[in-house]
Each structure stands twice: as C-alpha cells, then as structure tokens.
C-alpha cells in the first residue's frame, strides 16, 4: 500500500504564556491555524521490519532525531508492529521557522501510518499519542483553527479562519525555543486578549482577529534579533492590517484582506528577506491519496 498525505504549516494568531509549571514547561494559551504552505509525505508499507526516511531537503536528519522517525517508532513499539515503512518527505515549509514544520510532518506520519498499518485509531487517540513526542503535534493532528492550552497539547476546535491573505517572511537566522521561553518574564509583558481572539474567530470578524493578535515571545525574540522587528515594521509600513511573529520565531507573518495589498507587502519583503511566501488559510483543497 502507498499513500500520500499533506502536512500544512501553522501560525499562532495569539500566543500567551501564563506561568511556569512545576514540570518546567509554561502553561500556554495559543490560538493557531493551519495555512496552505505544506510539506507532502509519501508512505509505502514494507514487509521488512524497518523505518526508512528519505528527506528531500538539506540539514534534516533521517534517523531517530527526526520527529517522523520517532512517530513511526512509537507506533511500532506501542502496537507491536512487525511491518516497516518507507517515508519520503517533499519539504516546502521552512526549517526552524516557528511554523511547526517538523511537528506537522510527525502528525501527518501518524495519520498515514494509522492507515497503512491498519491500526484503526481515532484522531483523538492519535493526538493523545502524539503528546509523547512533542507539545504542538496534537494541534497538527487535528489541523484547522483551534485553541491550545496546557503545554500546547490540549486542543479545543474553533471555526475555520475567515478568508484572507497571509504573507510570511523568514530571516536567515535561527532561534532556540527553549532559550526564548527561559528568558521570558511572564509578569513583565503585555499579554494578548485570547478571549477576544476566540470571539472574533467565532464571529468571522477579520478586523477583530487583526486587533487581537499578540505573542508574548516577541518580547524576547525581537529584543535579541532586531532583524525580526524590522521585518514586522516593514510589513506594517507596506499596508498589512496585522503583523506578528509565529511561535518563538524567527518567521513573521502579515494578515491582509485584499490581494492587491498582500501583493504589495509580498513584493516589499522580497529582496529584504530571503524566504518570503504568500499563502491563504488552509482549506484542505489538496486531498490525500491512497493507492
């Protein structure tokens, strides 16, 4: 059996950290949505008991360091699977960008393996299993738009993000998520209005969504990396209704109603930033296939 499955990137419309928990993680409230910038995974069931990864991108491991490999190994051990799998990954999501590319790939792998190994697991079961690998994989299992709480693994679905244009720009720098969280001072930062964001999404109110964007991690990342702030400022100067860093960065995204204005923002970032994308909220228009 062979299947292909998409793994869309995500952005944080709002990201709040409330306090540091006893387990070392922060208690978070994040409103996230998937976008139509996506990787694609091709899975082939093997008779041999082995996991083979083939990543069509540089600097991405093909061994146990890869979340896809960890997802496959977790399912094999949990359910005593004696079959193997070959997974080929066609990468489009930037690496280490704050867009959950690795987590989305792992989520897609879990869903694909559930099919080719005929496990019969529900989405809820896959999401619960995924939390053993990473905090934000559960959201990627569900996709769409949702509120994530706890350390990011507790998911409450929300209506789809209203139609708009999204321009993403990733500078050529890397950001350490653990370092950003370690330096975050939750008592000395402006917190986003998560309730207002949820209300705006439920009402399909784009202006309310634009006004409610916020990310407490900007207080650290933008201070340490002025280039990220310059990208955000440039987006707003070219007409973005809202601009925000995704996750711990370094990618910044702009939210824009009109195509012509989005194109102006996109063109204004090209040449200023190496990786620039113009996308839409995820619509699941690209179907997964099974052969």
Swiss-Prot record:
Gene Ontology MF terms: 4-(cytidine 5'-diphospho)-2-C-methyl-D-erythritol kinase activity; ATP binding
Record's keyword terms, sorted: ATP-binding, Isoprene biosynthesis, Kinase, Nucleotide-binding, Transferase
Regions crossing the membrane: none
One GO term of the biological process aspect: isopentenyl diphosphate biosynthetic process, methylerythritol 4-phosphate pathway
Pathway: Isoprenoid biosynthesis; isopentenyl diphosphate biosynthesis via DXP pathway; isopentenyl diphosphate from 1-deoxy-D-xylulose 5-phosphate: step 3/6
SUPFAM superfamilies: GHMP Kinase, C-terminal domain, Ribosomal protein S5 domain 2-like
Enzyme Commission identifier(s): 2.7.1.148
Catalysed reactions listed for this entry: 4-CDP-2-C-methyl-D-erythritol + ATP = 4-CDP-2-C-methyl-D-erythritol 2-phosphate + ADP + H(+)
Top-rank lineage group of the source organism: Bacteria
Residues annotated as catalytic: 10, 136
Binding positions (ATP): 94-104
NCBIfam families: ispE (TIGR00154), PRK14608.1 (NF011202)
HAMAP family (alphabetical): IspE
Entry's family note: Belongs to the GHMP kinase family. IspE subfamily.
Reported function: Catalyzes the phosphorylation of the position 2 hydroxy group of 4-diphosphocytidyl-2C-methyl-D-erythritol.
PANTHER family in the cross-refs: 4-DIPHOSPHOCYTIDYL-2-C-METHYL-D-ERYTHRITOL KINASE, CHLOROPLASTIC (PTHR43527:SF2)
Name listed for the protein in its UniProt record: 4-diphosphocytidyl-2-C-methyl-D-erythritol kinase
Organism per entry: Listeria innocua serovar 6a (strain ATCC BAA-680 / CLIP 11262)
